[in-house]
Amino acid sequence: MKHFDHIVVGSGASGLTATLLLALQGRKVLLLEKAPQVGGSLARFRRGGLPFDTGFHFTGGLTEHGLLSRMLRALGLADEVEPQFMAADKAHRFVFESVGRTIDLPCGLSAMRQKLKADFPGEQVAVERYFDLVEKVCAQTGTMDLSRLTEPSARLDEEYVSLKDVLDGLTGNALLKGVLSGLSMCYGVKPSEMSFASHSRVCYDLYESTARFKAGGETLIEAFQRHFRGLAVETACSCWIEKFDDIQNDQAGKALLNTGEEVAFGSVLLTIHPRQILKLLPPEQISKAFVERVMAFEPSLGFFTLFGTLDGGSHDDTVSSITSLFPLTDFEALLDPAYRGEQALVIVGNEEAVGGVRRRTATILEPAFPQAMEPWQDTFTGRRPPAYQAYKQERVAAILKHLVRYDARYGEHFQTTDSASVLTYRDYLHSFDGSAYGIKQKLGQYNLIGRLPVRNLFAAGQSALLPGVAGAMMSSFIVVRSMVGRDAFNRFMGTRLCN
């Protein structure tokens, strides 16, 4: 029987980060991935030779002192990825269709303050107060700064108040509230359900800058894999844990894999959905309260996605800005699973060199919730019924109609390459429900992070801390500290941050 110091389950951003952090400290690590390839939603797929991003479309935190940049430096990966930043004057373009207003958001909190005060001359106090609060939350959050990761953290007052309540207290201007809620598409929770603290932590680095990696998330996967080769890391794809065994003194000693192999371990980090974690825990080791807590977690937003090309004409703005079309200013409605009006769209353009030819691609994201997929929950890719195919055709037609109404050039130049539903993501990524951000990060909720009832099992991932690549990676920094011991991890981080 093989023995590993640690097993990491799931090879998305969190699992890759944890594996490298553990291996860099001399640990022997087994990385398990249920899919045929590592990387999760960081990976790309290709149609007609053109690459498209599966789930990692853009991120914040890639400025010199940004959180993601600092994590990449600590991992030794910073020089192996190349950020491509959105336009400084309009990283995000918000089009509020019901009121006929377009608001461009520049990079940098200072520039954004000035821009929004100019756009909303009667709301200058509200704008200043909002950004003051965002900066206050992030300054008081130790995990937003790797050099302060070892500091004890306390829950802030802003953990207990919703984004909606804060915005309602600042202004009665519906459009301004819509602008300040716009990046909620990056975590998929209604303003009344999201704490202002969590909203601030997600948005802060996106306000400072928005970027993608050249060659997409694949370049990050490849960087991790290069570093694994010189370390005690073994990777197994199409492989997962069926059950834990040899439970003694509230600790598991070995895991039975789907291959029939048994492996022994010191500890296991599970970067998968909390419901999937729950299925792995021996029933006699968990309380009714623990089960109820996990079962109460709700799915976050997912997306119906249209992939295509934009050859011909001028579409520079689709490459340099993230454009969001919002039919309403009310994000309580737009992010409600029960909403049946016209959906928002997020347009992410890119430019790729294929065979020496520059091609423009566009990924169109339309909000969709796992709940809407209930009629087809028990079906799988390639074996869906006609009603599901009709649903996909209906969504594609609605998205194309919406795009052309916004800009007639899409009718002339956009060519559909493929489409994906929430179920497509679920099956392709081997995820629990196909949601984009794991569980909803709800006000007053205690996520599953760190040590589990089986005491040498741990939880991390974007459902554990914050959604997105940076949140998933940061959860691994926090939990690996518990796995290897605070003092040892602090010494390790001291050397990495000095490099």
Model-derived features with residue positions:
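N-terminal glycine-rich phosphate/pyrophosphate-binding loop and immediately adjacent elements
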Residues: K2-R129
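A glycine-rich dinucleotide-binding beta-alpha-beta segment and adjacent secondary-structure elements
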Residues: L175-Y187, R405-L466
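Helical element adjacent to the flavin cofactor pocket in flavoenzyme catalytic cores
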Residues: S200-G253
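C-terminal segments that line or cap access tunnels to active or ligand-binding sites in enzymes
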Residues: G312-A420
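Rossmann-like flavin
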Residues: S98-M194
